[in-house]
């Protein structure tokens, strides 16, 4: 059986870059990894494969939506460190439900008999306020991970995601493994002071702290994971450390996880407003 992770966070938070680097860290520690991009932008696997790969929707359109005519090679690309990537894709902008495609992608992998051949499956999911469609990966996940930055909008989105995880945990096995603090800046952004307080309030922890660093942005534009960058890059080890830390925790015998206790929508405005 595969260990399934669902990675969520506010749009533009660095979720796909973080997901790709977590996948790379896991793969370099010996895990066979599948990363599934669950965003109509279909750029989740770009740092792994170095290109915008064909989406499940595009592949299905080519065979007039006859699932049985597709093989794994039609929808899965292998990239850095042997990581397999799949992009669910979505309908044209302004039409249809992007979340519906996520469930269809999982069904297709199961029909092909490849869903359970991986050690780790990582869903990289669009999710500011989680609708029913984009919450579908939580139905399959062992653990959810939230990517957040040290600001109110990000924390508000993280709290909404905690609500979705709590709701899903009633019927499914999913638990929250923790929050990854992204773009941590102790000189201008307050470090993780607000995230530390939020994590304690909802009953979770910070899995790791990813620094705000030009090298991370540079790797994304290069279409690479950090692990594929020139090993002589200054401060590379500092940037890699949090992803290795996350991978070690995920691959441990029993990762620490819990069902979060989210704050009410109106209450969070009062609570967070008092944090410094």
Curated annotation (Swiss-Prot):
<feature type="binding site">
    <location>
        <begin position="182"/>
        <end position="183"/>
    </location>
    <ligand>
        <name>ATP</name>
    </ligand>
</feature>
<dbReference type="GO" id="GO:0036070">
    <property type="term" value="P:light-independent bacteriochlorophyll biosynthetic process"/>
</dbReference>
<comment type="function">
    <text>Component of the dark-operative protochlorophyllide reductase (DPOR) that uses Mg-ATP and reduced ferredoxin to reduce ring D of protochlorophyllide (Pchlide) to form chlorophyllide a (Chlide). This reaction is light-independent. The L component serves as a unique electron donor to the NB-component of the complex, and binds Mg-ATP.</text>
</comment>
<keyword id="KW-0067">ATP-binding</keyword>
<protein>
    <recommendedName>
        <fullName>Light-independent protochlorophyllide reductase iron-sulfur ATP-binding protein</fullName>
        <ecNumber>1.3.7.7</ecNumber>
    </recommendedName>
</protein>
<dbReference type="GO" id="GO:0019685">
    <property type="term" value="P:photosynthesis, dark reaction"/>
</dbReference>
<keyword id="KW-0460">Magnesium</keyword>
<keyword id="KW-0602">Photosynthesis</keyword>
<keyword id="KW-0547">Nucleotide-binding</keyword>
<feature type="binding site">
    <location>
        <position position="16"/>
    </location>
    <ligand>
        <name>Mg(2+)</name>
    </ligand>
</feature>
<dbReference type="GO" id="GO:0016636">
    <property type="term" value="F:oxidoreductase activity, acting on the CH-CH group of donors, iron-sulfur protein as acceptor"/>
</dbReference>
<dbReference type="GO" id="GO:0051539">
    <property type="term" value="F:4 iron, 4 sulfur cluster binding"/>
</dbReference>
<comment type="similarity">
    <text>Belongs to the NifH/BchL/ChlL family.</text>
</comment>
<comment type="pathway">
    <text>Porphyrin-containing compound metabolism; bacteriochlorophyll biosynthesis (light-independent).</text>
</comment>
<keyword id="KW-0004">4Fe-4S</keyword>
<comment type="subunit">
    <text>Homodimer. Protochlorophyllide reductase is composed of three subunits; BchL, BchN and BchB.</text>
</comment>
<dbReference type="Pfam" id="PF00142">
    <property type="entry name" value="Fer4_NifH"/>
</dbReference>
<dbReference type="GO" id="GO:0005524">
    <property type="term" value="F:ATP binding"/>
</dbReference>
<dbReference type="GO" id="GO:0046872">
    <property type="term" value="F:metal ion binding"/>
</dbReference>
<dbReference type="InterPro" id="IPR000392">
    <property type="entry name" value="NifH/frxC"/>
</dbReference>
<dbReference type="InterPro" id="IPR005971">
    <property type="entry name" value="Protochlorophyllide_ATP-bd"/>
</dbReference>
<feature type="binding site">
    <location>
        <begin position="12"/>
        <end position="17"/>
    </location>
    <ligand>
        <name>ATP</name>
    </ligand>
</feature>
<dbReference type="GO" id="GO:0016730">
    <property type="term" value="F:oxidoreductase activity, acting on iron-sulfur proteins as donors"/>
</dbReference>
<keyword id="KW-0479">Metal-binding</keyword>
<feature type="binding site">
    <location>
        <position position="97"/>
    </location>
    <ligand>
        <name>[4Fe-4S] cluster</name>
    </ligand>
</feature>
<keyword id="KW-0149">Chlorophyll biosynthesis</keyword>
<dbReference type="InterPro" id="IPR030655">
    <property type="entry name" value="NifH/chlL_CS"/>
</dbReference>
<keyword id="KW-0408">Iron</keyword>
<keyword id="KW-0560">Oxidoreductase</keyword>
<keyword id="KW-0411">Iron-sulfur</keyword>
<dbReference type="InterPro" id="IPR027417">
    <property type="entry name" value="P-loop_NTPase"/>
</dbReference>
<feature type="binding site">
    <location>
        <position position="131"/>
    </location>
    <ligand>
        <name>[4Fe-4S] cluster</name>
    </ligand>
</feature>
<feature type="binding site">
    <location>
        <position position="41"/>
    </location>
    <ligand>
        <name>ATP</name>
    </ligand>
</feature>
<keyword id="KW-0077">Bacteriochlorophyll biosynthesis</keyword>
């Amino acid at each position: 059986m595969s260990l399934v992770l669902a990675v969520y966070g506010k749009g533009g938070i660095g979720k796909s870059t973080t997901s790709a680097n977590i996948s790379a860290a896991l793969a370099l520690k010996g895990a066979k990894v599948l990363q599934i991009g669950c965003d109509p932008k279909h750029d989740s696997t770009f740092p792994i494969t170095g290109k915008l790969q064909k989406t499940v929707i595009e592949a299905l359109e080519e065979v007039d939506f006859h699932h049985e005519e597709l093989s794994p090679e039609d929808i899965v690309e292998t990239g850095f460190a042997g990581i397999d990537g799949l992009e669910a894709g979505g309908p044209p902008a302004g039409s249809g439900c992007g979340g519906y495609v996520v469930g269809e992608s999982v069904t297709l992998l199961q029909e092909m008999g490849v869903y359970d051949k991986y050690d780790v499956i990582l869903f990289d999911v669009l999710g500011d306020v989680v609708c029913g469609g984009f919450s579908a990966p939580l139905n399959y996940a062992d653990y959810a991970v939230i990517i957040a930055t040290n600001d109110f909008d990000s924390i508000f989105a993280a709290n909404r995601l905690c609500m979705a995880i709590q709701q899903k945990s009633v019927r499914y096995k999913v638990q929250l493994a923790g929050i990854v603090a992204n773009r941590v800046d102790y000189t201008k952004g307050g470090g993780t002071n607000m995230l530390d307080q939020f994590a304690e309030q909802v009953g979770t922890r910070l899995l790791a702290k990813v620094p705000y660093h030009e090298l991370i942005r540079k790797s994304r534009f290069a279409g690479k994971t950090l692990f594929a960058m020139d090993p002589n890059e200054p401060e590379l080890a500092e940037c890699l450390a949090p992803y290795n830390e996350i991978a070690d925790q995920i691959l441990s015998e029993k990762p620490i996880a819990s069902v979060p206790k989210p704050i009410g929508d109106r209450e969070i405005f009062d609570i967070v407003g008092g944090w410094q």
